[in-house]
């Protein structure tokens, strides 16, 4: 019997025990795949994307040798959400004004008028 697909879905991060092939998810219990900001709520520079990918790799590597569970995936997802919030507050990413819905899920934008 194969292991079931594990996944974690937060507001801005989706993590799956799978690999991508031709834009399809293929179950693979030996790999984790992250989908960053699937709703395009933020504007991302390549450097910011790389920072999140590197943080994801660090969090995954810290779990090597541990049993992979829903809890572990949720913890990684929550840690990445916090990391994105820090990046938003530092101005490394910004809200996408062309997003389908502007709900400011991580707080109002920090602008001189609001400070």
Curated annotation (Swiss-Prot):
Reactions performed catalytically: a plastoquinone + NADH + (n+1) H(+)(in) = a plastoquinol + NAD(+) + n H(+)(out); a plastoquinone + NADPH + (n+1) H(+)(in) = a plastoquinol + NADP(+) + n H(+)(out)
Subcellular location: Cellular thylakoid membrane
Record-listed E.C. numbers: 7.1.1.-
Membrane topology (UniProt): Peripheral membrane protein
Summary of subunit composition and partner proteins: NDH-1 can be composed of about 15 different subunits; different subcomplexes with different compositions have been identified which probably have different functions.
Family: Belongs to the complex I NdhM subunit family.
Name of the protein described by the UniProt record: NAD(P)H-quinone oxidoreductase subunit M
